Amino acid sequence: QVYRGMDIGTAKATPEERRLVPHHMIDICDPDYPFSVAEFQERAAALIEDIHRRGKLPFLVGGTGLYVESVCYGFSFSEGGADESYRAELNEYADRFGNASLHEKLREIDPASAARIHPNDRRRTIRALEVYRLTGVPLSEHLAGQKKESPYECCIIGLTMNREKLYRRIDE
């Protein structure tokens, strides 16, 4: 929901909904901007602090589980930086052999991350492989050691939707 123009399939609040209730971090960057979970966490924490200062109750709505948990549990992101040449190599591999083959490489070194990341989510698959290459430690182990006592009083609610209904809604 942070990306401009990415409205289909994101359940992004409509302009009318945004007029009724203040929303933050919607349409804040272009789709080609590499918006990371660490940046999300930093921006969300600043907004939460600002909203609290104004005597209001913030709601963190939407996003992936990792993004929400990073804010609620104060994850620290020190998985070794980035390796652009390795990312390019993995992208070329996926272009040639497919996302499923790339995902299988992840399953071999980090079954827990592979179980959590969809085989077609190339970006997250590559990031998990990159973290392992840079640190020698699977991403799942990095994440397992990061959950802390929440700095906030959180109430986490998850919603699901019937798959057929979801696809119909996306098609509309």
Regions found by a protein language model. Name each.
Residues 1-172:
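Phosphate/pyrophosphate-binding catalytic cores of soluble transferases and nucleic-acid-acting enzymes
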